[in-house]
Structure formats: C-alpha cells, structure tokens
C-alpha cells in the first residue's frame, strides 16, 4: 500500500498526475506479456493495473474480453500469473502494482489465501470488480490483514452516503468511473464529475484515478483539471495489442508512443 502513498507524494511534488495502464497478464502470450509490461514502464507508466484472465469478465467490453481469450488460448492460468507478478515485482521494486479481479478467482484460492499470495509476490492493491461495496467486508478484511489495499469503485451517480462509505473503506486509490457501463475506449469518458472528486477529498478518501473510456491525452488533462490524481487506460492499450498481435515490434513501439503521449498529458 505504501507504494501508492509514495507515488502520489512524488507526483504532487512535481505537479504531475499518474498515468496507469491496464493489461491482462499473459495477453497475447506470457513471454510477450512481460515485454509489454517492460515497454509500458519504460515509456512512463507510473503504476500498473493488471488483470488475471477470467472466463466471464462482466465489467469488461469486447476488447478486454478478447484479451482474456488470447491469454487463455496461450495456456495462462492464475498460477502462471502469480509467477509473472513475482518476476515483475523483482524487476521493478518501487512501482505500485494493482490487480483487477473477479470474485470467483479469489474464492477459488480462498479469500485469505489469495490475499496472502498477493502480499507474497508484492501486490499493492486488489480491485474485485463484481463485488459491491456492501458485500465487500470479507475481501477488505483479508486485504488489510495482508497489507494489500482494497480498491473501492466510485460510480458516477454516487450519493453522499455512498461517498462517505467509499472514503471510509478504500485504500491505495479510489477508482472513479468516468461513466456507467462496461470498459471500452469506443465509449468516450464523460466529463469528470468534479463534485464527486471534491467531496471524496473532503472525506479524506484515497486519491482518485479516473477510468473507463480514457483513450486520448485531452481526456487525461480534463480528469486532472477536475481534481483527480490521475487516469487509468485499458481498452485503448489492449486494442493496440490486438491490432498488432502478429507484429510484436510494431506493437511495442505503438504501445510506447501511446503511453508517452498520455503520460505527457499528466504534466499539464
């Protein structure tokens, strides 16, 4: 958890926001997946949000669903993913690493055992996408026991009572949904809801990162001007992987260019 605090402090001192890419571990295969993660970090990613392939990713649109299928077809299992995570952490000791998960993957290992495994390989946060806040207590308790930040989603229609709960229960960062629905850059991010961000700050919530539909530098700037601490981009990145799956050199260069452009937007 402390890696997020250190990151946000360092960025604030430089008057920068965070740019956080999302990819699915093992997409399109384990070897290239690790090269992709190297490329994202080398191009300026401030933190990583990583998915473990899941057969029924309800919160995701077709782009990330296809990433899950590619990873599955290359034989990736949760055990492989944890091996990859240990490799990434050993190579990059300072960068915050978060997992975006579905509850069945946590249940399969056992809630406490899963979070213990996360701590063992150096994971900083876990967002369980299909568990609403009111059902999240066992996950949050296990996360905190193992010093893993439980990430809480803030929907765009949150009322004051929910914002208080989000501020109370979240750690690491707060995942601010730019709009309702599933992931996908084909649906643009709405204008950030500044009153949500201001209220979360008033209630001392973990810093907000805006996600869903972030695909252009202008959207990153808009999110930061509204008061977020940064932005998460997933589908736009995964689409580059999908488009250039058969030409890794082009894929990696396109990914680097995309990350450089969106990271540059965090500098004002």
From Swiss-Prot:
Active site: 49, 60
Enzyme class: lyase
Pathway membership: Amino-acid biosynthesis; L-tryptophan biosynthesis; L-tryptophan from chorismate: step 5/5
Gene: trpA
Protein name: Tryptophan synthase alpha chain
Keywords: Amino-acid biosynthesis, Aromatic amino acid biosynthesis, Lyase, Tryptophan biosynthesis
InterPro entries (alphabetical): Aldolase_TIM, RibuloseP-bd_barrel, Trp_synthase_alpha_AS, Trp_synthase_suA
UniProt xrefs under Pfam families: Trp_syntA
Catalytic reaction annotation: (1S,2R)-1-C-(indol-3-yl)glycerol 3-phosphate + L-serine = D-glyceraldehyde 3-phosphate + L-tryptophan + H2O
Family annotation (PROSITE patterns): TRP_SYNTHASE_ALPHA (PS00167)
Family: Belongs to the TrpA family.
């Amino acid at each position: 958890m402390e890696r997020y605090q250190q990151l946000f402090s360092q960025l604030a001192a430089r008057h920068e926001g965070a740019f956080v890419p999302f990819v699915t571990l093992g997409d399109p295969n384990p070897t290239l997946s690790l090269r992709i993660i190297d490329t994202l970090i080398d191009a300026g990613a401030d933190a990583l949000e990583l998915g473990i392939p899941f057969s029924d990713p309800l919160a995701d649109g077709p782009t990330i669903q296809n990433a899950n299928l590619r990873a599955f077809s290359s034989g990736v299992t949760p055990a492989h993913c944890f091996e990859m995570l240990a490799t990434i952490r050993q190579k990059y000791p300072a960068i915050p690493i978060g997992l975006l998960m579905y509850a069945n993957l946590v249940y399969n290992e056992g809630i406490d055992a899963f979070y213990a495994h996360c701590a063992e390989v150096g994971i900083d946060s876990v967002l369980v996408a299909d568990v609403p806040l009111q059902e999240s207590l066992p996950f949050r308790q296990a996360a905190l026991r193992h010093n893993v930040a439980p990430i809480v989603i803030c929907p765009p229609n949150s009322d004051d009572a929910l914002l208080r709960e989000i501020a109370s229960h979240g750690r690491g960062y707060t995942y601010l949904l730019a709009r309702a629905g599933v992931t996908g850059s084909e649906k643009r991010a709405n204008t950030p809801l500044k009153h949500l961000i201001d209220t979360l700050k008033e209630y001392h919530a973990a810093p907000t990162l805006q996600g869903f539909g972030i695909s252009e530098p202008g959207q990153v700037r808009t999110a930061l001007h509204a008061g977020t601490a940064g932005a998460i981009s997933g589908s736009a990145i995964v689409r580059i992987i999908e488009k250039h799956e058969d030409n890794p050199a082009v894929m990696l260069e396109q990914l680097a260019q995309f990350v450089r452009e969106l990271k540059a937007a965090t500098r004002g």
